[in-house]
Amino acid sequence: MSPPMSPMKPPKGFAPMSCCWSTETMQKWLPFLGWLPDYTWYALKMDFIAGISVGLTVIPQALAYAEVAGLPPQYGLYSAFMGCFVYFFLGTSRDVTLGPTAIMSLLVSFYTFHEPAYAVLLAFLTGCIQLGMGFLRLGLLLDFISCPVIKGFTSAAAIIIGFGQIKNLLGLQHIPRQFFLQVYYTFHNIGETRVGDAVLGLVCMVLLLVLKLMRDHVPPVHPEMPTGVRLSHGLVWTATTARNALVVSFAALVAYSFQVTGYQPFVLTGKTPEGLPDAHIPPFSVTTANGTISFTEMVQGMGAGLVVVPLMGLLESIAVAKSFASQNNYRINSNQELLALGFTNILGSLFSSYPVTGSFGRTAVNAQSGVCTPAGGLMTGALVLLSLDYLTSLFYYIPKSALAAVIIMAVVPLFDTKIVKTLWRVKRLDLLPLCVTFLLCFWEVQYGILAGTLVSVLILLHSVARPKIQVSEGPMLVLQPASGLHFPAIETLREALLSRALETSPPRSVALDCTHICSIDYTVVLGLGELLEDFHKRGATLALIGLQVPVLRVLLSADLKGVLYFCTLEEAEKYLKQEPGTQPYNGSEDSVPEHKIALLKA
């Protein structure tokens, strides 16, 4: 159910700090000040329901994602609550929930060597980097990671994460974590499958699938429905929304039933420390049996993770925020989202959190529950803290196969098969970065993302260096570049002009239509100067038409000799025919039309 109107009012912009903190400035830095004065009892009720729903989802997921990250289960819960509280103050989306995710947990497992100290330090450094990007407004770096690269990465990650849980689903032991070795040893040791784990895991997967299908097909409730029908609808909706908690509780109950009989056919999660860890600064060194590992050595060990983890965290979080903002008709502030995520990771690291980001699945639960403001996260965070205080003794009985089922069912939607058909229909060349990213991610995630991004940038540069040039015949030959003109493209333009105009007999005059050119650089100016000389030597004319003001300003500053520019093609053709009353604009601002002069001086 969705509320008729939310009191959430995200800020329109992100203003720099000033010495005078006005109310508007305060609301931009602390968005909750904008919607809190208008908070209603209706919003409180809906936020409470949404917070409970998300809390029942995040607790079993957090335990499961800690396994993906290669960390003890309690670290998933340590990572699940701080974002709820920080986002209340700093977030600009009413739907987003921050916490552990499958993708981020996978990245953590690659760069932290399954050592909690490394994971906590990575969270701190990730937060610092994200915070710096937010203050410096460097979110634009994410624009260079194209959609095919993201889809290739998430699809590969879904396979890596999903297959990584087969060992827990089947109760296999001593399986390496490197993907290719994992595949080999999983099939090699398939004969050691524990029947109890396999049966329970498959039953949990079936239950999760059935409950999800029920959730997707529950008809909307209407006020005119009888009370009994609405009550039944609420019960079904609650059960299907909290399906992860329901299925994990069922599995734990089954395991406990066997435990009291003295026979245990399942591999259990085991003892989980009670309570929240004491707040402390992240470890900047680690003492092992072989000696002390310094901060510098820890950072060197993380390597590319200090780039990949912050960027992918930002990308995932902002993608989720933008998706639900568009779906629910409100706006977010991307730079403010960076700050919220950065502060979450920094403060979370004080309580042994590993890096977190926005969760698409839990955000969807939040939105479908009718959340009105980020206040819903307060209830989610409170539930996680309560579970750490009072439920950790019960986590002992949760079978690992049940958590594996939760993870597998959570990552299945990440594998996007439709994107291949869409790209084949829209632009087949975009399949190249998708495939490069997808394949190389099985080797190393950072290589996949880097190679895919590089291929995407090369495709972009190719279109810049080889712009399409439309040619029209007439009294003058008209060449119109279909996009901007920058230094890699000057040789393409030269080749087109030489082959179409100067290498013909006799040489032809050309009008270069600059309608689509909004900027040029110094190399282009030099290239145009050389072309003007070539045309002059062969007794032909090169005229520029449709110049935009920024381009005209650059040409005037360069003081090119012999450059002719006209407002329209008709004026250029009249000048070529030497019809009276037509003169080119060249030489200085004195010859430029009055409306252009006004724009130049504006």
UniProtKB/Swiss-Prot annotation:
Family per similarity comment: Belongs to the SLC26A/SulP transporter (TC 2.A.53) family.
Q: Which GO terms describe its biological process?
A: chloride transmembrane transport; oxalate transport; sulfate transmembrane transport
* Record's keyword terms, sorted: Anion exchange, Cell membrane, Ion transport, Lysosome, Membrane, Transmembrane, Transmembrane helix, Transport
Q: What does the UniProt function comment say about this protein?
A: Sodium-independent anion exchanger mediating bicarbonate, chloride, sulfate and oxalate transport. Exhibits sodium-independent sulfate anion transporter activity that may cooperate with SLC26A2 to mediate DIDS-sensitive sulfate uptake into high endothelial venules endothelial cells (HEVEC). In the kidney, mediates chloride-bicarbonate exchange, facilitating V-ATPase-mediated acid secretion. May function as a chloride channel, playing an important role in moderating chloride homeostasis and neuronal activity in the cerebellum.
PANTHER family hit by this protein? SULFATE TRANSPORTER
Query: What protein am I looking at?
Result: Sodium-independent sulfate anion transporter
Q: Which residues cross the membrane?
A: 48-68, 70-90, 116-136, 144-164, 194-214, 247-267, 301-321, 338-358, 371-391, 395-415, 439-459
Topological domain spans for side Cytoplasmic: 69, 137-143, 215-246, 322-337, 392-394, 460-602
Q: What ranges are annotated Extracellular (topological domains)?
A: 1-47, 91-115, 165-193, 268-300, 359-370, 416-438
- GO MF term list: chloride channel activity; chloride:bicarbonate antiporter activity; monoatomic anion transmembrane transporter activity; secondary active sulfate transmembrane transporter activity; sulfate transmembrane transporter activity
Which reaction is this enzyme known to catalyze? hydrogencarbonate(in) + chloride(out) = hydrogencarbonate(out) + chloride(in); sulfate(in) + H(+)(in) = sulfate(out) + H(+)(out); oxalate(in) + chloride(out) = oxalate(out) + chloride(in)
Q: Where in the cell is it found?
A: Cell membrane; Lysosome membrane; Apical cell membrane; Basolateral cell membrane
Instruction: Give the matching CDD domains.
Output: STAS_SulP_like_sulfate_transporter
Keyword flag Cytoplasm? no
| Origin: domain of life | Eukaryota
Q: Which residues form the STAS domain?
A: 466-580
A Pfam family (short name) is: STAS
**InterPro entries according to UniProt:** S04_transporter_CS, SLC26A/SulP_dom, SLC26A/SulP_fam, STAS_dom, STAS_dom_sf
* Bilayer topology: Multi-pass membrane protein
Q: Name one GO cellular component term.
A: endoplasmic reticulum
